[in-house]
UniProtKB/Swiss-Prot annotation:
The keyword tRNA processing does not apply. SUPFAM superfamilies: Alpha-L RNA-binding motif. GO terms for molecular function: rRNA binding; structural constituent of ribosome. Belongs to the universal ribosomal protein uS4 family. GO terms for cellular component: small ribosomal subunit. Pfam families: Ribosomal_S4, S4. Residues 91-151 form the S4 RNA-binding domain. This is Small ribosomal subunit protein uS4. It comes from Corynebacterium glutamicum (strain R). Part of the 30S ribosomal subunit. Contacts protein S5. The interaction surface between S4 and S5 is involved in control of translational fidelity.
Length: 201
């Protein structure tokens, strides 16, 4: 599956948001790259909408074609299209693994899922974009639990703060999906209405 593998810090600086999580290089220089990076320029409405779309894409690690499919589905659903879009993105398996504290970044979570370390309701899943549902049970596969990474993660899970819509059982390396998230429970710096306006043109 195609994915962006370029320099994350440069993208973070361009979009003015930490796309990685704990990116010290971005914190030191949170302005766009280039000699004129520090200068303030007047941004057009279109540019603001485009940047917000790109921000969402890179936060969740989604390529353009796949992002369009997410938007199309969000638009078909009842309710606010922008909020539907964010909920769909947040419901990806790789994001759930990240939110549960089993990975330090979404990129790392995507890699762990791709390598087949998880099951959902007892079935092995290696597709990062797999969409979780309410009452799903996600486990680290038994043979993967002995890996150093998961042993260390297990210790850290005891004090981990996870979203209210998830529950983590550290001793079993298990994630329970109590419900799908609501927009108010998703703490990402995103103005999704700008994305709706971008695709509505």
């Amino acid at each position: 599956m195609a994915r962006y593998t370029g320099p994350a810090t440069r993208k973070s600086r361009r979009l003015r948001v930490d796309l990685v999580g704990g990116d010290m290089a971005f914190e030191r220089r949170p302005y766009p790259p280039g000699q004129a990076g520090r200068a303030r320029i007047k941004e057009s409405e279109y540019l603001l909408q485009l940047q917000e779309k790109q921000k969402a894409r890179f936060i969740y690690g989604v390529m353009e074609k796949q992002f369009r499919r997410y938007y199309a589905e969000a638009n078909r659903r009842a309710g606010k299209t922008g909020e539907n879009l964010v909920v769909l993105l947040e419901s990806r398996l790789d994001n759930v693994v990240y939110r549960a504290g089993l990975a330090n970044t979404r990129r790392q979570a995507r890699q762990l899922v791709s390598h087949g370390h998880f099951t959902v309701n007892g079935k092995a899943i290696d597709v990062p974009s797999f969409r979780v549902s309410q009452y799903d049970i996600i486990n680290v596969r038994e043979k993967s639990q002995k890996m150093n990474w998961f042993e260390e993660a297990q210790d850290n899970l005891v004090d981990a703060v996870v979203p209210a819509w998830l529950q983590v059982v550290p001793e079993n390396l298990r994630i329970l999906v109590h419900q799908l998230p609501e927009r108010a429970q998703i703490d990402i710096p995103l103005q999704e209405q700008l994305i709706v306006e971008f695709y509505s043109k």
